[in-house]
Every structure is written in structure tokens, then in C-alpha cells.
A protein has these predicted regions:
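Long, low-complexity, polar/charged, intrinsically disordered or flexibly structured peripheral segments
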Residues: 17-32
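Extended polybasic, low-complexity segments that bind anionic RNA or targeting/receptor surfaces
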Residues: 28-210
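Generic detector of short alpha-helix boundary/capping microenvironments
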Residues: 1-4, 21, 46, 146
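Single conserved hydrophobic/aromatic residue that forms the stacking wall/gate
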Residues: 1-12, 16
Length: 210
């Protein structure tokens, strides 16, 4: 056959060869070939749940967030003077002789992460931020090669009406999640099925859930 035809046939045959062997590597009928009817990765393992059951689970998880004993038993650290539920509206920061007051929902973008951490420390929740930061470990197994290198403990959950501003401020703080009230579910309030997550609410979020 012409030289070009020999090259094309040789390239096509190389696709089915393994290094150092002459048997096909993708044909299920040959030795060393792929599995004929392997498991399908596209299988959907999700299960349907009634809407009333979802609502009941979410409400039960919300009730657990106002119980200091359940929050403490989950491993969270906070000042004993804190009264639950934790609801905030505005925050005043004093720094370098200047006083700044801002709405929590519309946190200024400049130095927003520093302001967010200072706000949590002012509420008496700084110890839990340090717990999540120091508890960050490298995951065992192949997850380190698949974008899941670190395992970070869950820390504060912040429920807001609009998550745009606070989400950007808290996205680099380990263990902190910001969720809009309309998207709140039991998995956010009780990660892993453990009730009593340390939760901070904004007044706007409370109004949005009414």
C-alpha cells in the first residue's frame, strides 16, 4: 500500500496497543482488554425526598442552632457570654483612632476579609475561626490529586438575605460558609448529619424567612 496508508494504519493500531505488548488494550474480546460491561459513572444515586420532610429537617436543624449545649457538643468554640440565637444588623469598628459603622449585608469590598474576621471576633467567635484554621489537614488518599487536597472543619455559618457582598469577604476564611436565606437547607445547618452548627443570622435574613 502507499506510504501514507501504512502510516495511517500504523497510527490506528497503536491506539489499541499497550506499551511492550501486542494485544489490544481496548477490545473486550482480547486478553488484557477493557471490561465488556463496566459500571456506568453516570448513574444517579440521588433519592427523592418529600418537600414536607425537607422542611421538617430544616426546621429541626434551625432549632438546634439556638441550643448552646448542642452547638458546644458539636465542637464549636465561643465565649460563654454569647446568647443564642446570634442576630446582627450593623457593626461598628474602631481602628487607628477612627470609628466606622457599616451594614453587615453591604460590607465594603476594601479590606472586607479583615473586617469580617474582626466582626466575628467582636461577637466572641474568634476562637472557632482559629479552631477551623488550625484543624485544616491534608486529606489521605487520592483526593489530594483530585482537587480535594485539604480537609477543613466546618466553622461559622452566616445566613443572609443577599450573599453577594459577604460571600466575597468570607470565601478565604477556612470553614466559614455564607448562605442566602432562600437557599438554606438542612445540609448547611447540620453538615454530615450533626446538629448544632454555630450559626449567625442577619435581621434581613430573618425577615426573608418569615
Amino acid at each position: 500500500p502507499p506510504r501514507s496508508t501504512r502510516k495511517e494504519s500504523s497510527a490506528a493500531s497503536d491506539v489499541y496497543k499497550r506499551q511492550g505488548q501486542t494485544t489490544g488494550a481496548q477490545n473486550p474480546h482480547t486478553r488484557g482488554g477493557r471490561r465488556a460491561h463496566g459500571p456506568k459513572v453516570a448513574k444517579d444515586w440521588s433519592q427523592k425526598l418529600n418537600s414536607k420532610q425537607k422542611t421538617l429537617a430544616r426546621n429541626s436543624a434551625i432549632a438546634a442552632t439556638v441550643n448552646p449545649d448542642m452547638v458546644s457538643s458539636r465542637g464549636h468554640n465561643f465565649d460563654e457570654s454569647i446568647r443564642f440565637p446570634i442576630i446582627i444588623d450593623s457593626y461598628t469598628e474602631s481602628r487607628e483612632g477612627s470609628v466606622e459603622k457599616f451594614d453587615v449585608e453591604s460590607l465594603p469590598l476594601q479590606n472586607s476579609t479583615r473586617k469580617f474576621v474582626a466582626m466575628m471576633e467582636g461577637l466572641g467567635l474568634g476562637a472557632d475561626l482559629n479552631r477551623a484554621k488550625s484543624g485544616r489537614t491534608i486529606r489521605a488518599g487520592k483526593g489530594t490529586m483530585r482537587g480535594r487536597k485539604y480537609r477543613t472543619p466546618k466553622s461559622i455559618l452566616l445566613v443572609v438575605a443577599n450573599r453577594d457582598g459577604l460571600h466575597k469577604a468570607a470565601r478565604n476564611v477556612p470553614g466559614v460558609d455564607v448562605v442566602a436565606a432562600k437557599d438554606l437547607c438542612a445540609e448547611d445547618l447540620a453538615p454530615g448529619g450533626d446538629l448544632g452548627r454555630l450559626t449567625v443570622w442577619t435581621k434581613s435574613a430573618i425577615k426573608a424567612m418569615e
